[in-house]
Amino acid sequence: MGYFWFPWFSAIFVAVFSYYIWQWTFWRRRGVVGPMGFPVLGVFLNSLDNNFPFPLQCREWTKKFGKIYGFTEGTLKTLVISDPELVHEVFVTQYDNFYGRKRNPIQGDSEKEKRTNLFAAQGFRWKRLRAISSPTFSNSSLRKLYQTVEDSALELLRHIEKQSAGGKQIDMLKFYQEFTLDVIGRIAMGQTDSQMFKNPIMPIVSKLFQGNFAKLFLIGGIFPTFLVEIIRQILLKNLKVGSFRKINEITLDAIHNRIKQREEDQKNGIEIGEPADFIDLFLDAKAEDVEHFGENNGDFSKSTTYTNRQLTTEEIVGQCTVFLIAGFDTTALSLSYATYLLATHPEIQKKLQEEVNRECPNPEVTIDQLSKLKYMECVFKEALRLYPLGAFANSRRCMRNTKLGNMKVEVGTMIQVDTWTLHTDPNIWGDDAEDFKPERWQTPNSDQIYQKSGYIPFGLGPRQCIGMRLAYMEEKILLVHILRKFTFETGAKTEIPLKLIGRATTQPESVWMHLNPRN
């Protein structure tokens, strides 16, 4: 009996093995250079090394293979580019062909998720979410959030004064994470006051960012799509409540409580006041022209009438949750890198403090004063150039067969920008590309010139980060208050250069600083 089944098992094994070898050699068969990795796995194992972030690995491969190369991650095929013309073609010129993001199949189909967020959505649904959400990040909306952000900044300043007393070094990364979580908690998750250094959400969020999803992504990268979806549904039904689900539940409770409060106020004849946070803004948000958007067989470029101009409760949960995930780590890291660079370049820090003294002479700092801090903007831009912390987000998925340069690109191919190489390319930035030089941003039209050439810390094109202005507002408010009272100085615990770690984002292991009180 065993001999009867042996040929069948052998044939199946050979067929499966041949299939994976065929996938593994995809780029080689097309004459595209790149790292091969291992059969079946490709370079998947490289993406799991927390001590050598994958964006830095891509930078090393670019040095070896050039500005365009390919690799496989299981059955996923990725083309890496760092040529500014190709980047502009993918993100802007051919946006209609590359409007999807790079996703692992284990993450599911974003179009079928009730809580799909603006980052993951694509096509018609992305257009609708973007249209409804955009007013939430307008200047007028940010003004309504300003006082909450500044209150959190002043609360952090009190903790800094206490913890750094007596010349003690403090890890600014941890302090900045407390600040950004406090802000997001208050403007997106229904938190009513500051919970800094006692926030019950912090362990949940930290666990989410420190989580190892390697096994899940391995399943998504290796197994056929239909099997991945079956496994995914089983996991969703049987997994214990994880960090992501806990955050969703906290947000959903906050939204339901806000809706209930609004209904009670209306019954009692109480008018709804000015929006206090994202929940209020999203509940009020409408897009007048959303009826012009539509869906036609999944093709976002063809429209039919769709009249739901407001977000559903589930969609509000999705937006608030993704803003927590996107805003917590990235803003804290941007502040951390800027702090490190200022401490290691005291002449630049002194120049920035002079601007702060000049433009913000009074204890109260207004949102209009922030717009006058031009040199501070240059400092943050330059910090994000040298440390593009969210480089993984600069990726796209090919949605239609097309050509990129002279290369044919098939549907399903992932495009990943090597942002670290792009941001320090001497052909773009000059011989001082590796230097921290905020003054390079003071040249006329520098924003337009550099973005066209390849400066993309917040992405590029229609899908550029919607929260960019909020992030800058948070960073400016906090840095103004700190630099008015302290000067950042390195100490015995400061790692120079920084030791970089991470998977989803590239972050320093720590940013220990002395905060020397100013006269």
From Swiss-Prot:
Residues engaged in binding heme: 465
Q: Which residues form a coiled coil?
A: none
Q: Please give the cofactor(s) recorded in the UniProt entry for this protein.
A: heme
Q: Which InterPro entries match?
A: Cyt_P450 (IPR001128), Cyt_P450_CS (IPR017972), Cyt_P450_E_grp-I (IPR002401), Cyt_P450_sf (IPR036396), Insect_CytP450_Detox (IPR050476)
Q: Keyword annotations for this protein? A: Heme, Iron, Metal-binding, Monooxygenase, Oxidoreductase
Q: What is its EC number?
A: 1.14.-.-
Q: Which domain of life is it from?
A: Eukaryota
SUPFAM superfamilies in the record: Cytochrome P450 (SSF48264)
Q: Name one GO molecular function term.
A: oxidoreductase activity, acting on paired donors, with incorporation or reduction of molecular oxygen
Which Pfam families does the protein's record reference?
p450
Q: Does the keyword Heme apply?
A: yes
Family membership noted in the UniProt record: Belongs to the cytochrome P450 family.
Record function comment: Cytochromes P450 are a group of heme-thiolate monooxygenases. They oxidize a variety of structurally unrelated compounds, including steroids, fatty acids, and xenobiotics.
Q: List the protein's name.
A: Putative cytochrome P450 CYP13A1
